[in-house]
Swiss-Prot record:
Required to maintain light harvesting efficiency, especially during nonphotochemical quenching (NPQ) recovery, via the regulation of chlorophyll excited-state lifetime probably by preventing the formation of a slowly reversible form of antenna quenching. Disruption phenotype: High light intensity-dependent and irreversible nonphotochemical quenching (NPQ) due to a decrease in chlorophyll excited-state lifetime. Substrate binds at residues 80, 89, 118-122, 141-144, 183-189. This is Protein SUPPRESSOR OF QUENCHING 1, chloroplastic. Its EC number is 3.1.3.-.
Amino acid sequence: MALKLTSPPSVFSQSRRLSSSSLIPIRSKSTFTGFRSRTGVYLSKTTALQSSTKLSVAAESPAATIATDDWGKVSAVLFDMDGVLCNSEDLSRRAAVDVFTEMGVEVTVDDFVPFMGTGEAKFLGGVASVKEVKGFDPDAAKERFFEIYLDKYAKPESGIGFPGALELVTECKNKGLKVAVASSADRIKVDANLKAAGLSLTMFDAIVSADAFENLKPAPDIFLAAAKILGVPTSECVVIEDALAGVQAAQAANMRCIAVKTTLSEAILKDAGPSMIRDDIGNISINDILTGGSDSTRNSTAMLEENTVSDKTSANGFQGSRRDILRYGSLGIALSCVYFAATNWKAMQYASPKALWNALVGAKSPSFTQNQGEGRVQQFVDYIADLESKQTATTVPEFPSKLDWLNTAPLQFRRDLKGKVVILDFWTYCCINCMHVLPDLEFLEKKYKDMPFTVVGVHSAKFDNEKDLDAIRNAVLRYDISHPVVNDGDMYMWRELGINSWPTFAVVSPNGKVIAQIAGEGHRKDLDDVVAAALTYYGGKNVLDSTPLPTRLEKDNDPRLATSPLKFPGKLAIDTLNNRLFISDSNHNRIIVTDLEGNFIVQIGSSGEEGFQDGSFEDAAFNRPQGLAYNAKKNLLYVADTENHALREIDFVNERVQTLAGNGTKGSDYQGGRKGTKQLLNSPWDVCFEPVNEKVYIAMAGQHQIWEYSVLDGITRVFSGNGYERNLNGSTPQTTSFAQPSGISLGPDLKEAYIADSESSSIRALDLQTGGSRLLAGGDPYFSENLFKFGDNDGVGAEVLLQHPLGVLCANDGQIYLTDSYNHKIKKLDPVTKRVVTLAGTGKAGFKDGKVKGAQLSEPAGLAITENGRLFVADTNNSLIRYIDLNKGEDSEILTLELKGVQPPTPKAKSLKRLRKRASADTKIVKVDSVTSREGDLNLKISLPDGYHFSKEARSKFVVDVEPENAVAIDPTEGTLSPEGSTMLHFIQSSTSASVGKISCKVYYCKEDEVCLYQSVQFEVPFKVESELSASPTITFTVTPRAPDAGGLQLQGTR
């Protein structure tokens, strides 16, 4: 997770700031202030005019200059409603207060002022966001708002019209001007207000309300639509407004604007730059509208002349004087900062004065670039000596006594850590960059094992779920962390030391002073040299203490993991036609294959130990594999071997594993394009296979991109994402940014892939033609660098709140299922309506089978679904596979899949072969007549029905086992069947006792021009010597193809 202390976006600079965790620049999205989007985010005029709306409208190009002595032709007047025609702004705020009072939330009418003129949804939702109202339902709140407002405040003929409103509208019509109401309110409120004000709807040539628009004021869409309906050019329209959003919308639409002071002061309005300002609508004359008036409230001729002389064009196309740019820019900065602070409060809570100072001038540390030679350690020794002599180093605060510890008893600097060199690792377990540095810390711990040195992990949570001690304990177990870890959930140590990014290391001296502070990954050498220098310097001062710390490793206190068949399983895949479930048994470093009822079939990677090795199923090794994708055509399984930074391929025909990309080293290439293992990868977390073009799409969590591997040419390259860790939806790969994508699934039409963008807590759709993306649910749709918009709220689109989703799956019917991992829930997303609903889970981590609403999971991750609607879930922290029958609707239950025959891995030699001798659940057992001759040739002939042939690519094979092992010598013991499906085995019985030979065959065959199929058959041949004569018995068998729903195994296409 490339996260730093978040700051409001600049509207001027195109600054690039360095991400401390990924060491790639994070660009601050910067556009000149023109108007705001629906939620108040300031965007450029160009951007806004290109944004999609439900009603298609277009603006005229603004004139290059405005004549200073001519107001210009006026053909239409567009009246805002609230605050202009109707004295309803205060009434609206009072109705909104009533809504929140009913919810038990204390608010005041002033809380709603910043959101006036932006539409009811934002009007209510903005305050709900600021007040941190959990479970806020904007649709329900909006409905209740209208009920209260219409019933209590806006009764017909209640006299809410401003004095002079009726007269001015009438006078405009008498002058031949067209008049329209153009309001950000919904039509129901517009009609009610006009009636309450005594203004007949028939007075107006058009009434344009919020219902038909995606973008409300300050976007120009409503005004542009009104002009289009009236048939009047935008340059001939005059707008009357009371809100900043309205003034800005008028400017964006190239319309003159008269502002009234019914809501805001003249000073605030003047900064927005309206054409003129009046107290209220009763003070606007027809002369003001037709000629622009003549008093000081209109922009003066001198100022207009100054603007004409000093016209400058900004990089974003804004034309105006330097004064205009400064004026509008200052207003934009102010309002952007207010909105940013309100919507990014979770990010802002990590700030501290010291963090801001460190972000500006840098924390105290030696230079790591000046000397890379042999004298580097001595350079750091000299630096430490200078630091101690000046006594300028920061003292590390003591750990608060209330903090919980893992892997150790509570530690204190003045007691346990005194006399030791300490690295404080500020981390949060969701962060991919924090995972990347764990091998560096392990290296240091091993190198300085017998010395007065230790690492202390200071867990400083980003997500709410990460503050839970049990969740952190599971992370410690999952990543095999053996050093002490403290749960600093309230960020005390973080703030005191001014930390502003994950991960950050503080190297602390034996006397509790900060020697160096280093942010980001890739600093093994720097940390190693600083620690070596510290041990050298303080060793010479005789202040080191080698007393061991009181360790108590969590892995030694959790017996369940020692006997569990699975250990933190990550992802799933299904071979529906072959009745197989693939499980990435991540912390056992293997892939498990069962049938759909949980019966063991085979394992790939037998030792359970971390490794990186190709070869047979027994010899192959993985390192915490995650994503899986099945290629039915070739009977291959693609594996995202995450901590080997590799893409692996499991070949079930030849029972081999090979590496397709990556070589075990973490890469930093953001473009790719190399072939095979020459192309390095960076923490691939999930994969999906696109069969038409034969591409494997990779969710590259480590560098926030989507990559593709071509099966046809073996080249791996970036597909989408510029590598910046952001939540940015663009139209091209270069303008799109992801934030630790951790799940990927193809849509049924293969036109889009769906992404679980975990760090932005959003679900996004990736266009497989253009490489661009769009938001479906969750995340912050406006501030791309705000990765702190998370929670637990069902709803539609951006109102949805998720918490670090890790898995996504699109079913054949187009419905999307997702694991809302840190909310411990399974949810469903309709990609058309963008509505998200909870299917299962309570929101609290736990384990409980039963009805979906009451059942509990613990950080679920991977998903897979069968054709008959059984949804499998990798329940990661429970180390279980769960499933839901989706056909039962509200009566659905979460049940636990019983894994029969799946054992924890064992490092014993040939353990895999022993397991494979057992017939799998899909094997047909054929018992044949006894063989009574001492010696002979056993002929095996397998035939197929008409219309089928043996596969030429996937050769059928056999393997022979005998019980007892040495009772019969059979040669060969394994091999392939002939193209006609036959083989001959020579046998010699060495014992007169009865024995059994088992000939296990894997038969691959195809129907002409259709799918290819697979059948597992085991022939049990009894042996007993009754004759010394030689014989050549024959075993015949005809394969009977089985339908998919009967469990028959099918392979798409190998012919």
